[in-house]
């Protein structure tokens, strides 16, 4: 509701930290949001400093499977997860013949994988820069329902991430900035030292 009234703020909820995050621009906007929430909902807000947003990926291919078979349900999904180019996000494709699994089931599996925000096995940060290929799947003529593939595909992704962690190929991605710095000659040495100390690089 407030986000609709003040479109420049962005409100989001983190499943990992169980916190509501708001992108604000300065103290004045912070005070305005506090005031609105207090007047409308009688809630006193407390804003804490933001934390670093990490993401996770993998450094080597991993084959994984997810199985879901409670009473009168059945689905099995096999995936190949591969590292993708930085900044590419998550790509989901099928390498499976329609002779093995009908196309509508394949689309369902890919949609189920895409709809979930998958978290890595290191810090529980959002997964990114991964290519996920559907390489095999099984259904039961009588017992398979749509939600069964959702459970099996989510389990397959999770299992793949756990295998990557166990193999030492899970990767934590830290945010970084590219910027141009203009300084007097006498300050260049100090700036270069500071950048190196913070694991930065320069040209």
Where are these regions (language model features)?
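Accessory interaction regions appended to the cores of large information-processing enzymes
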Residues: 1-203
């Amino acid at each position: 509701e407030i986000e609709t009234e003040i479109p420049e703020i962005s409100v989001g909820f983190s499943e990992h930290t169980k916190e509501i995050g708001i992108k604000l621009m300065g103290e004045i906007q912070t005070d305005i949001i506090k005031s609105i929430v207090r007047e409308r909902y009688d809630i006193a807000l407390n804003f804490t400093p933001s934390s670093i947003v990490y993401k996770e990926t993998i450094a080597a291919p991993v084959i994984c499977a997810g199985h879901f078979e409670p009473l009168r349900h059945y689905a099995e999904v096999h995936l190949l997860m591969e590292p993708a180019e930085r900044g590419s996000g998550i790509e989901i494709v099928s390498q499976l013949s329609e002779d093995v699994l009908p196309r509508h089931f394949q689309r369902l599996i890919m949609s189920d994988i895409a709809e979930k925000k998958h978290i890595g096995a290191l810090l529980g940060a959002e997964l990114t820069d991964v290519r996920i290929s559907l390489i095999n799947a099984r259904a039961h003529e009588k017992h398979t329902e749509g939600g069964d593939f959702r459970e099996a595909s989510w389990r397959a992704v999770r299992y793949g991430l756990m295998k990557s962690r166990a193999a030492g190929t899970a990767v934590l991605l830290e945010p970084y900035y590219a910027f141009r710095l203009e300084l007097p000659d006498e300050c260049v040495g100090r700036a270069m030292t500071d950048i190196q100390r913070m694991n930065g690089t320069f040209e």
